[in-house]
Amino acid sequence: MQAKGIQLAAAVLLLVGSWANAVEVPADVLFARKIQPLFKVKCLTCHGDDPEKLKGDLDMRTRAGLLKGGESEESALVPGKAMTSPLYLAVTRAHEADWSAMPPKENDKLSAEQIGYIKEWITAGAPWPDAKRVVAILKEADPWGETDGVMVKTSGGLDAGWTNRKYDPQKLWAYQPVSKPAVPAKGHPVDAFVEARLPKGLAVVPQAEAVTLIRRVTYNLTGLPPTPKETFEFVAAWKKDSESAWVALIDRLLASPHYGEQMAQHWLDVVRYADSAGFSNDYPRPHAWRYRDYVVRAFNADKPYDQFVREQIAGDELEPNDPDHLIATGFLRMGPWEHTAMSVAAVTRQQYLDDVVNSVGVTFLANELRCAKCHDHKFDPIPTKDFYRMQAVFGSISFMERKLPWQSFENITGIQADRERYLRQQKTKAIRSITTLPEADRPVQEFDKDSERIGQGKVNNKRRQQLKFQLKRSTPLAFSVANDANDRIHILKGGSIETPQGEVSPGVLSLFSGSEKSASVTSEQSGRRTELAQWITSRENPLTARVIVNRVWQWHFGQAIAGNPNNFGGTGKRPTHPELLDWLAATFMEEGWSLKKLHRRILTSATYQRAVAYPTPETLAKLDPNKTSYAVFTPRRLTAEELRDAMLAISGELNRAQGGIPAHPEINEEVAMQPRHIMGSVGPAYQADPKPAQRNRRTLYAERIRTLADPMLEVFNKPGPDVSCERRETATIAPQAFTLMNSPINHARALAFAARLEREKPGDLNLQIVRAFQLTYQRQPLPAEMKACRDHIAKSLAHHKATKPVKVEPPKYVIRQMVEEMTGLDFWWVEDLDIYSGNEYVPDLKPWDAKPHTRALAELCLVLFNSNEFVYIY
């Protein structure tokens, strides 16, 4: 084991130290290409940009300045001797006893490769060619660049070396015009393109069975299971004419209002939707839900995708009097953001501008534009100037809660009841002393009275501020933006507002036009975003259609054609089927950017309808190790939202009402009661809505609080709303099984399911079991399954007849503890839970209220909910 460890260490050292042998170049070329640009980005902010404020009195603008040294009065540079040069010793960060680590911030430290360049340059005598020689060097071929690559004209980088560099053409695939290649064979175009790239020796599998297909496509398009009636009717139609039955099913599902909800869930993953602002204060966003509902409506109406994009970027400019256009601009504010009395306005404003540019890039162009924030993009032809020119597009906007009356198409149920609840809370004291509790229930018997008085007063004041935010929800406002700012945007050296460089004018990415001028948009306060949106949705823009087509493909197959839907750049995965992607993108634009037509085209292909099993799995694994051939359909697990919604639908509890203010479903009680920092204090405990119909809505409509995740959803890989999610992960971990089997919330679903079976098939256990299988699996139980179910219920019934469940009441209050900052002592208070302690709360069916037979039948229902056949889509 020791020898193995030594070999590993030697390998690491070889990796770090072998950089110098990769490219052998003259030292002056090394300086011009690597050292001088490195100094500009990493060093001159403190040691040269402002000669009057040189940190440590060290001037790194010239060789003479380095030789002179700084406050230590020791030369920072010993030409020919890197190991005695303080400059080299400082950047290695390995000699901090003698020389402070430089750059000082850990996240700014140099890479091993950069440190190696400095070492080689010093060892070679640290030459410093004059400006004329540097210009000449930069016009020559870059020894580290792509020798056979292509140059891309842009608005220009921060240095000539970047501007003139070459790129591997294969990594620029996404920036090439969308073509419409000829379909390689007769039949369905999708199948023709897929089968043209099948590995030699690999055949496609036959079509899946009808029941498998209706389950697959119903979940994919609506996020809900098909009903037994829908399944029966489809199978009957399939037997008569499978092709027409399949097309009719797809059309019915695309016309379902639940289609828009399922597609909106995908979209909200990308745009980072949440009902709170995040960060330490996590301010509520009382009207963000109107954007969520706008997205649902847009998908259901099959709004042309190019129009959908334009409305979200510039809806207020395009149609300032149209409600949906105003609501759509909520997209521009979806990211986490916070500004408090402690914040520096310029910093938080810059954070917003950085975020919104990157969000537009990721969402619509599949480009992480923030990679060009501190320096020219390392892998793509996107100069820093373009990043800040796009910021200038948004420099005219400010946040606005626009007055916008509730619309006839909006669901405003519950808004008035919400308002009345919060008004009641305003009139009562939000918290009370622990002395109001029986002595046995108090956490302590003695405490400092002054700390309690001061601390409770502060907490109470904060509660009232929080209530004011909640009351805003009853006022009809749109979470939007307006053109009433006039920021002057500069390139920020290193991305820092403390080092502004040249001012820039509004513009778009210049790599498509080749110059700054041709990539410019208006400098007028209004209209910038309109021109940006028009550029993004232009048919000449090669990214936009490819990006959304790629996303839709992934929504159906679980993997995208280009494997990184948020990154079409040089570091992203290249398309496995580039001709198919281009053909779909070109056709998508030709057909009016219709997403429903795109879905229909993909879903009617044999590729989508394939079975999941290959006759010789070892052949499939050998010829298609990355599972990109589509010779079979790859099964997927239900998403967290689909899992919860399906259990509610099957148990008969799902409230299918659409839209409206966020719902508050039941979540894990321990998490709900835990203290949560909000608005500079402890936020109120999470309480579920009082009525089952309110809390048992689709998960899409559940309130998304950035600092309070539902554990049930989180454990099944629901992404957080802080970062754009390009692809849902489906990790398999033990807590998933524990949650699905042991969670009291899932037990409640199983109990409600059992009660439904008893209502629909009273007194007949056989019919109840059959109905359970039909609802959960869309099929009849096999004889062996029927016997196993009957045997288990018989044994379980005897147990439940002999055992009476103990009644458990919901908590009526929670005790909180904090340290009073003025005294440094602990204080406590009691927070009353108004919903649980009032008369409004109607619990779900509980074991102590259910008959023994219901509880026994619920055990079977719970097993069905925990089975792979339910949890996975095949």
Enumerate the predicted regions with their spans.
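Bacterial N-terminal signal peptides
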Residues: 7-18
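Solvent-exposed helix-loop boundary motif
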Residues: 21-119, 128-191, 195-196, 211, ...
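Beta-propeller blade termini and top-face loops
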Residues: 263, 268-270, 274-286, 291, ...
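Primarily short, surface-exposed interaction patches in extracytoplasmic proteins
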Residues: 185-258, 272-320, 381, 421-694, ...
